[in-house]
């Protein structure tokens, strides 16, 4: 039992969620609420990052489950939180802060794919907008020699203000220079490039061909190196495509295996059957259970080499795993005569010799709501004992 569920609620998972479920939840939410896509959701993005940072670490998660957020803040597992952007970059393969200072920003896109796409391979065209260096001014922002050091911040891009907070006590506040917007330089409006308006970069449409190889997995990343946003003086970042697999109506993927449930009738479980299965590459395979091979309810069997192709070894495949659900006939489906005949065909049942010490009881259908109602009525009864309800009482003389 966990002390509180706030972090689990933020990620939209249950307290018993696996690491894979946590990763999938963080991936979807981080991409949805990233400041580049939702500038007004900075606090939400921070909450998502903090929740994942704690729950993805086994020691921090154990501490949180026992003591809640307060236990994390008190520093029992390292204390404090990392930068939300650093967590995002490390998760999506973008490196940390130092790497970002040398390179332009990576751009992350989520691409929805089907299980068929991952089985057969596919090619998708993705249209996106990216920053490229303005070719009119060659990334200068204006005429040659027009760029000058910002006199307001002296080229640092930051302003420092001293604020007195009490007698003999001052506070130093650092903020982005409003004159140059943190660039450390400025260009006179008359000298600015007409194409980029002094920003040095322009937006450009880019069409990417995304090749999805056979056997790729949900959450796998496809990286286009150097295709991210460009900035003067920096190496371009990457475009990272994250695959997001939709649920399939029949199959569930488990590593390299495919899992499915199959309903069969009692006669099929006892006497054998043949069942067709439509595969993800539009073939039809037929599975056979021969007469005399009893299939029990809940039995799990597999077909070799009919699972998912193995990534980069597409001629090798995992297993198709099938769990059988045996459907029994309804009450009264046989007449007494036929039931007697069926009994003779089946293995002999064991008879019970009744004694006087035995009691006959009736077997009835189970009602899962019965215990809930009994529990509710019991609470109401106890409440009446401790807090009698108002009403008419007998008078005593």
UniProtKB/Swiss-Prot annotation:
<dbReference type="GO" id="GO:0030317">
    <property type="term" value="P:flagellated sperm motility"/>
</dbReference>
<keyword id="KW-0143">Chaperone</keyword>
<dbReference type="GO" id="GO:0008270">
    <property type="term" value="F:zinc ion binding"/>
</dbReference>
<keyword id="KW-0492">Microsome</keyword>
<feature type="binding site">
    <location>
        <position position="153"/>
    </location>
    <ligand>
        <name>Zn(2+) 2</name>
    </ligand>
</feature>
<feature type="lipid moiety-binding region" description="S-farnesyl cysteine">
    <location>
        <position position="394"/>
    </location>
</feature>
<feature type="binding site">
    <location>
        <position position="180"/>
    </location>
    <ligand>
        <name>Zn(2+) 2</name>
    </ligand>
</feature>
<feature type="binding site">
    <location>
        <position position="177"/>
    </location>
    <ligand>
        <name>Zn(2+) 2</name>
    </ligand>
</feature>
<dbReference type="GO" id="GO:0007283">
    <property type="term" value="P:spermatogenesis"/>
</dbReference>
<dbReference type="GO" id="GO:0005783">
    <property type="term" value="C:endoplasmic reticulum"/>
</dbReference>
<keyword id="KW-0636">Prenylation</keyword>
<dbReference type="InterPro" id="IPR001623">
    <property type="entry name" value="DnaJ_domain"/>
</dbReference>
<dbReference type="GO" id="GO:0005829">
    <property type="term" value="C:cytosol"/>
</dbReference>
<dbReference type="GO" id="GO:0051087">
    <property type="term" value="F:protein-folding chaperone binding"/>
</dbReference>
<feature type="modified residue" description="Phosphoserine">
    <location>
        <position position="335"/>
    </location>
</feature>
<dbReference type="GO" id="GO:0051082">
    <property type="term" value="F:unfolded protein binding"/>
</dbReference>
<feature type="compositionally biased region" description="Acidic residues">
    <location>
        <begin position="353"/>
        <end position="365"/>
    </location>
</feature>
<protein>
    <recommendedName>
        <fullName>DnaJ homolog subfamily A member 1</fullName>
    </recommendedName>
</protein>
<dbReference type="GO" id="GO:0016020">
    <property type="term" value="C:membrane"/>
</dbReference>
<dbReference type="InterPro" id="IPR036410">
    <property type="entry name" value="HSP_DnaJ_Cys-rich_dom_sf"/>
</dbReference>
<dbReference type="GO" id="GO:0043066">
    <property type="term" value="P:negative regulation of apoptotic process"/>
</dbReference>
<dbReference type="GO" id="GO:0005634">
    <property type="term" value="C:nucleus"/>
</dbReference>
<keyword id="KW-0862">Zinc</keyword>
<keyword id="KW-0449">Lipoprotein</keyword>
<feature type="modified residue" description="Phosphoserine">
    <location>
        <position position="83"/>
    </location>
</feature>
<dbReference type="GO" id="GO:0042026">
    <property type="term" value="P:protein refolding"/>
</dbReference>
<keyword id="KW-0863">Zinc-finger</keyword>
<feature type="domain" description="J">
    <location>
        <begin position="6"/>
        <end position="68"/>
    </location>
</feature>
<keyword id="KW-0963">Cytoplasm</keyword>
<feature type="repeat" description="CXXCXGXG motif">
    <location>
        <begin position="150"/>
        <end position="157"/>
    </location>
</feature>
<dbReference type="InterPro" id="IPR008971">
    <property type="entry name" value="HSP40/DnaJ_pept-bd"/>
</dbReference>
<feature type="propeptide" description="Removed in mature form">
    <location>
        <begin position="395"/>
        <end position="397"/>
    </location>
</feature>
<comment type="subunit">
    <text>Identified in a complex with HSPA1B and BAX. Interacts with RNF207.</text>
</comment>
<dbReference type="GO" id="GO:0009408">
    <property type="term" value="P:response to heat"/>
</dbReference>
<dbReference type="InterPro" id="IPR044713">
    <property type="entry name" value="DNJA1/2-like"/>
</dbReference>
<keyword id="KW-0256">Endoplasmic reticulum</keyword>
<feature type="binding site">
    <location>
        <position position="196"/>
    </location>
    <ligand>
        <name>Zn(2+) 1</name>
    </ligand>
</feature>
<keyword id="KW-0677">Repeat</keyword>
<dbReference type="GO" id="GO:0050750">
    <property type="term" value="F:low-density lipoprotein particle receptor binding"/>
</dbReference>
<dbReference type="InterPro" id="IPR012724">
    <property type="entry name" value="DnaJ"/>
</dbReference>
<dbReference type="Pfam" id="PF01556">
    <property type="entry name" value="DnaJ_C"/>
</dbReference>
<dbReference type="InterPro" id="IPR001305">
    <property type="entry name" value="HSP_DnaJ_Cys-rich_dom"/>
</dbReference>
């Amino acid at each position: 039992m966990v002390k509180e569920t706030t972090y689990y609620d933020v990620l939209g998972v249950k307290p018993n969620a696996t690491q894979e479920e946590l990763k999938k939840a963080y991936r979807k939410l981080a991409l949805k609420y990233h400041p580049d896509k939702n500038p007004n959701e900075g606090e939400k993005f921070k909450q998502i990052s903090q929740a994942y940072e704690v729950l993805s670490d086994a020691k921090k998660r154990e501490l949180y489950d026992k003591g809640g957020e307060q236990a994390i803040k008190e520093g029992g597992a390292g204390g404090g939180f990392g930068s939300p952007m650093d967590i995002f970059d490390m998760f999506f393969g973008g490196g940390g802060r130092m790497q970002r200072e040398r390179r332009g920003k990576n751009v992350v896109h989520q691409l929805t794919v089907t299980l068929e796409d991952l089985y057969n391979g596919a090619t998708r065209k993705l249209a996106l907008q990216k920053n490229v260096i303005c070719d009119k001014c060659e990334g200068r922002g204006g005429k040659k020699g027009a760029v000058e050091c910002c006199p307001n911040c002296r080229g640092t891009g930051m302003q420092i203000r001293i604020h007195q907070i009490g007698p003999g006590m001052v506070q130093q506040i650092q903020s982005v220079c409003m004159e140059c917007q943190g660039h450390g330089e400025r260009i006179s409006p008359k000298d600015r490039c007409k194409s980029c308006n002094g920003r040095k970069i322009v937006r450009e449409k880019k069409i990417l061909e995304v090749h999805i190889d056979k056997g790729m997995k949900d959450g796998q990343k496809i990286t286009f190196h150097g295709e991210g946003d460009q900035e003067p003086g920096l190496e371009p970042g990457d475009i990272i495509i994250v695959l997001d697999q939709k649920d399939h109506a029949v199959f569930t993927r488990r590593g390299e295996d495919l899992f499915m449930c199959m309903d069969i009738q009692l006669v099929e479980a006892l006497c054998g059957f043949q069942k067709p299965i439509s595969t993800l590459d539009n073939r039809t395979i037929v599975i056979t259970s021969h007469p005399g091979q009893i299939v029990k309810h809940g039995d799990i069997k597999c077909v070799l080499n009919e699972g998912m192709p193995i990534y980069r070894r597409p001629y090798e495949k995992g297993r198709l795993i099938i769990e059988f659900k045996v459907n029994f006939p309804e009450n009264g489906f046989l007449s007494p005569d036929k039931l007697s005949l069926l009994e003779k065909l089946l293995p002999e049942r064991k008879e019970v010799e009744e004694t006087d010490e035995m009691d006959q009881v009736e077997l009835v259908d189970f009602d899962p709501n019965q215990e809930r109602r009994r529990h509710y009525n019991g609470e109401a009864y106890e409440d009446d004992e401790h807090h009698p309800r108002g009403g008419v009482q007998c008078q005593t003389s």
